[in-house]
Swiss-Prot record:
Protein name (database record): UPF0261 protein SACE_5696
Classification via NCBIfam families: PRK02399.1-1, PRK02399.1-2
UniProt superkingdom: Bacteria
Protein family according to the UniProt entry: Belongs to the UPF0261 family.
Pfam families: UPF0261, UPF0261_C
Length: 411
């Protein structure tokens, strides 16, 4: 059976870590305890056994050696130990990992968790788990457990919370999950306003492929690209590239400057489109920046306000996408839905703007370096028309012919 790694600072949380390790081991899971204390090489509390792997051994995995960790400055020490822990775990067959900590321990342990493949069970019991945890979790599957009380001693509350977390890890490591490894995994990106298109395409792929749909909310795009980098995605149908709008105009659902980089790095077969490139996302209406208050705004729901992209923004969006796709070494098709890029971009709908769409399409056509494997395809339909789904599947078969899904690129 795979090994569970129980990680934390044994100089301050030895009893709690030992308690968790014992519960996981009681479920029949092999356990290795790992000390990441940064206070110095002498660690461990009187009421807890020493860790199986000491903090000096872990610190030695830092590129500059253990001295880079034990600096005497807590801030730099935590950052350096995080690097060391990531490198330490990377060299081991990790079946699952659980860590305990406050803000410092959470910042120390979660980078190593994020570096592990999606699907490896990861549990972080943290004092900061009840707030915004996006900086700790990012686009991965870390399960954050609020500690409720501080991680500072065993009591009736902490025993229950830590016990639940320990059993969650053990259950994840020992439970059976039906495998779909016989089908290559294909990623699709979707938004509410491109749902008809993506649902139709996904349903027609299911017989031969394992379609994985990602919500294009920033985190969704990053998650998809992480799986591409991990070799778990065999082809990408990136029909909803809307996260680029938020990057360009300062919306709340940007996937960052690295959007599309994994596609270029890996050469994965790629079919893309302009799904929801007509909109920038903000929160509730009152959160829309003052400079945008006179723009074409649409209240999607009480928590989401959409802003129509202008021709100038569309020009910048098109240039960004073209530059990224020019770097791709794999087969690329990028489809332009001339009838509109979303449900809101259709005749009579609030974001229908053929001029803005026209600028977007012209920039993509002029700046994308087209050749046999990298092509723009105009489609005279709205992105949600059934005929557009037909065009997507035709392009998909074309890119698969140019770049077959490899055996290693499966779920």
């Amino acid at each position: 059976m795979d090994t569970a790694y129980v990680v934390g600072t044994f100089d301050t949380k030895g009893a709690e870590l030992g308690y968790v390790a014992g519960l996981v081991a009681a479920r029949g899971v092999p356990v290795v305890t790992v000390d990441v204390s940064t206070s110095g090489p002498e660690t461990g509390t009187a009421d807890a056994r020493p860790a199986d792997v000491g903090n000096v051994e872990v610190a030695g995995h830092h590129p500059d050696g253990a001295a880079a960790v034990f600096t005497g400055d807590r801030g730099t020490a935590v950052t350096a130990m995080a690097v060391a822990l990531e490198r330490f775990l990377a060299g081991r067959a990790v079946g699952g990992v659980i860590a305990l900590g406050g803000s410092g321990g959470t910042a120390l342990c979660t980078p190593a968790m994020r570096a592990l493949p999606v699907g490896v069970p990861k549990v972080m019991v943290s004092t900061v788990a009840s707030g915004d945890v996006s900086s700790y979790v990012d686009a991965t599957d870390i399960a954050m457990f609020p500690s409720v009380t501080d991680v500072a001693g065993l009591n009736r509350i902490s025993r229950r919370v830590l016990g639940n977390a320990a059993h969650a890890l053990a259950g994840a490591m020992t439970g059976d999950i039906a495998s779909t490894e016989d089908k290559p995994a294909v990623a699709l990106t979707m938004f509410g306003v491109t749902t008809p298109c993506v649902t139709e395409v996904a349903s027609r792929l299911e017989a031969r492929y394992d379609p994985l749909v990602f919500h294009a909310t920033g985190t969704g795009g990053r998650a998809m690209e992480k799986l591409v980098d991990d070799g778990l995605i065999g082809a990408v149908l990136d029909l909803t590239t809307t996260e680029v709008c938020d990057l360009v105009a300062g919306g709340v659902m940007s996937a960052g400057e690295g959007r599309l980089d994994a596609i270029a790095r890996t050469g994965v077969p790629y079919v893309g489109s302009c799904g929801a490139l007509d909109m920038v996302n903000f929160g509730a209406f009152e959160t829309v920046p003052e400079r945008y208050r006179d723009r074409n705004l649409y209240v999607h729901n009480p928590q989401v306000t959409l802003m129509r992209t202008t021709p100038d923004e569309c020009r910048e969006i098109g240039s960004f996408i073209a530059a990224k796709l020019n770097a791709c070494r794999g087969p690329v098709r990028f489809l332009l839905p001339e009838g509109g890029v979303s449900l809101l971009d259709a005749p009579g709908q609030p974001f229908h703007d053929p001029d803005a769409d026209g600028v977007l399409f012209e920039v993509l056509e002029s700046e994308l370096r087209q050749d046999g494997d990298r092509r723009i395809v105009r489609v005279p339909h709205n992105i949600n028309d059934p005929a557009f789904a037909d065009a997507v599947l035709t392009a998909f078969e074309e890119v698969l012919g140019a770049g077959t899904i490899q055996e290693g690129q499966r779920e």
